[in-house]
Amino acid sequence: MNNLFAQSRSHWVRYDRYEIKTGKDGKRYITPEKTAKPDIYNPLKESSDMVLEALNVGMLMMNRSPEDEVEKAILTFVTHYGLLGLMTALPTTPSFMDYEAVYLPKNHFIKEESMETEDYLALFYPFDKLDVVKKGVESSWNVSGDNMMIALTMTFMNEPMAKTMSFQREYAEAYDWVAQQFKDWAFTLTTSILYYNDYDLIDEDTRNLYRMGMAAFGGIAPSYHIELLDKPTIYWDFHSLLLGIQMMFSFMLVDGEKPLRLCKHCQKVFLSSRSNSAFCSARCKNQYNVYKSRGKNKEQGGEEND
């Protein structure tokens, strides 16, 4: 996995502080704080840690952890890596500003197959609107007043307009949508693990259900080009962090040398150095054995009392 992206790079934007705000529609949104500062970084340098953190946020929901614990984990992830870029991830193209409307393939969040551009943008700017004018396929966007936002716009001026817009401080993503995406990734991992762990215990119909579930996992492959830096480097054109995570997760899922595993004790996702590793740490292994031993002792004590 690391070797695959060793000579690769990409760019994404994260802010140093995020908050959860409630919009007029009653929905909760994650958005940068008013005075938060943006930072441009290369997500491929942190690919393994990012995917593991995303999966473990999802596992909190799979294991029905308290809502405040889940909320804290989601905000921590977003502060580490930025929002998912759902605005550019959901449409058929991240360049939707160049079209008369926004066209949407089937997804978890929006039922409509197409939307007016203004209505679609409103889903991601529930608090402060950007100064955008849209007429047919023509669109213009005026950025003024905030030097940081102007600098971000200039940095990504060759990217699709919508991607650059999603890096602005006004941008927000629905909390429930972000949470659902983390849960979907965790569900995909557990489906894969259960399929192989329980293969001999389940019938062929159940196996087919697992296979169908995994076949639904996928995405549009990102484009890339080669840059001649100190050595030839692949630059991945991720137009959303979601797409980047999806691709990195896919490679990690099929990696036989360092497979993804679920800790038998704490249910935490970890990268294993061996295919048969069952615990994320020596501490978890020891605790598991202690609890297992106590359980046996209780059973024996109960039998003796009988």
Predicted regions and their residues:
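Short helix-coil boundary/hinge micro-motifs
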Residues: 1-270
